[in-house]
Amino acid sequence: MLNHLKDAHYDVIGIGKIADIFDNEGLTKSTRIKNNQDGCLKTLEVMKEDFNGLCFVNLVDFDMEYGHRRDPIGYGKAIEDFDVYLGQMKELLTERDILMICADHGNDPTYRGTDHTREKVPLLIYSKAFKETGILPDVFSFATVSSTLADIFSVQKTDLGESIIDQLK
């Protein structure tokens, strides 16, 4: 899907380890980060620019610093810190923008061991243009997000995933 966006001349900006995850495929710009704070600050910088496309961010501290290391206090503090940046991001959104927040897997900092955990992770979707709030049905994979983004940008979909665009109001 990132390649479809790029081929349609959209900006596809990766912040954090997005370039590593996707082997630099489909990105028009990539920025590495040191930590969550750096990632949030770089995201805010991009949001202040005039760009047309997708800004895809991975805040790795939730996983690497607090999840795998089983540090619930640090994890909680990281969520509180992110919440401050989220408020700033929300203020910069326009009526045309859609903000999606999700994790790629569970990593409960209170669970034994150091591996990923298997709980479901939320998908939060926000836009100033939405007129209603609600709860979406369970999303089964990132293919749902990919298909939804393809609909939002009117680009070719991949063969996987069902779009939930019609449920966003």
Predicted segments, located by residue:
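Feature captures the catalytic ectodomains and active-site-proximal regions of enzymes
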Residues: M1-K169
